[in-house]
Amino acid sequence: MNNLSLANEKTKIQVRGLEFFYNNQKSLKSIDMTIPEKRITAIIGPSGCGKSTLLRVFNRIYAMYPKQEARGEVLLNGENILAPGYSMNRLRSHVGMVFQKPVPFPMSIFDNISYAIKHHEKLSRREMEDRVEQALRGAALWDEVKDKLKQSATGLSGGQQQRLCIARTIALRPQVLLLDEPTSALDPISTGRIEQLITELKEQFTVIIVTHNMQQAARCSDYTAFMFMGELIEHGDTDTIFTKPSKTQTEDYITGRFG
């Protein structure tokens, strides 16, 4: 058993009274939670429980779609990212996201990484090469692609493509990394590599992962949040959530009685 406790952690994200609406229908109900800095927090729960919706609030990606609204507070470093004055560009520089299905850009491996950087920073060619290498090393992909950086990224395997997407995200040096079912489309070997990478990423980033795979949550995360029908049922250190949950609903889900 570990000795983790949210009370002893430095807070990265504080959620207060968060509610979310699709077409005026409430899908998140009064969420209060603390995301600790440079830890891995897993969000679990049955399909439709609101876990991916919650993840998308953390970078306001919902704002791209009509009739979606978040109310309440999501404090990143003490500032409310839902406030009208908090710019989307600033938020994107702080919070990066990797999606379920890897989507490499139809360009070279090198350009996949450099493309996003060019929109945020002006770097010399040497600085860009160094940044691309750092990102690929950070995503545990450098050794596999260092001799083919000019080749198309679409020729990579599924697992390599997902690590490329992670590299593309961390190249911008965000503070928070959101992962939405990052291994659901991958084979077991690729999944294992991504899971190992996730545990390494927390040295530099605050990581939040949504997963249907409870074993993955147990293996990778420091803290776990269980959601059901738009509500946060329980949130605590992963060992306790999986071995001694305080709520019956949590125990029923983890033991397979529903979900």
UniProtKB/Swiss-Prot annotation:
Reactions that this protein is recorded to catalyse: phosphate(out) + ATP + H2O = ADP + 2 phosphate(in) + H(+)
GO molecular function, one term: ATP hydrolysis activity
Signal peptide: none
Main location: membrane
GO CC terms of this entry: plasma membrane
Protein's cellular compartments: Cell inner membrane
Gene Ontology BP terms: phosphate ion transmembrane transport
Domain of life: Bacteria
Keyword field: ATP-binding, Cell inner membrane, Cell membrane, Membrane, Nucleotide-binding, Phosphate transport, Translocase, Transport
Residues the record lists as binding ATP: G45, P46, S47, G48, C49, G50, K51, S52
Bilayer disposition of the protein: Peripheral membrane protein
Protein name: Phosphate import ATP-binding protein PstB 1
Gene name in the database record: pstB1
